[in-house]
UniProtKB/Swiss-Prot annotation:
Keywords: Electron transport, Iron, Metal-binding, Transport. This is Desulfoferrodoxin homolog. It comes from Archaeoglobus fulgidus (strain ATCC 49558 / DSM 4304 / JCM 9628 / NBRC 100126 / VC-16). Binds 1 Fe(3+) ion per subunit. The iron ion 1 is coordinated via 4 cysteine residues. Binds 1 Fe(2+) ion per subunit. The iron ion 2 is coordinated via four histidines and one cysteine residue. The keyword Electron transport applies.
Amino acid sequence: MTEVMQVYKCMVCGNIVEVVHAGRGQLVCCGQPMKLMEVKTTDEGKEKHVPVIEREGNKVYVKVGSVAHPMEEQHYIEWIEVIDDGCVHRKQLKPGDEPKAEFTVMSDRVSARAYCNIHGLWQSG
């Protein structure tokens, strides 16, 4: 059974999906069950993976890590998203980009997630 906002990865082809509607079935890709990406908040490498949120009014600035995360061809942040009162705002990134994003939000309480192509899903807030 899936839950809204869970992230799954195909360990065969690398497809990544985020659940937008919960269901009872199992997510399958390439003939194999997809792997649920567990959300990490603290662990080894925290200084380079946990999103750091700064706020000025309704502007939210997110950078990945208190020490900038590498953005190299083999190791980079694929996306950053902010969850704002049920709304999801996402910025896709690629190697060479800076590991940061800016969003306009309406609620007072937000959280941020970032996905590292090697170390998985990280969250703060």
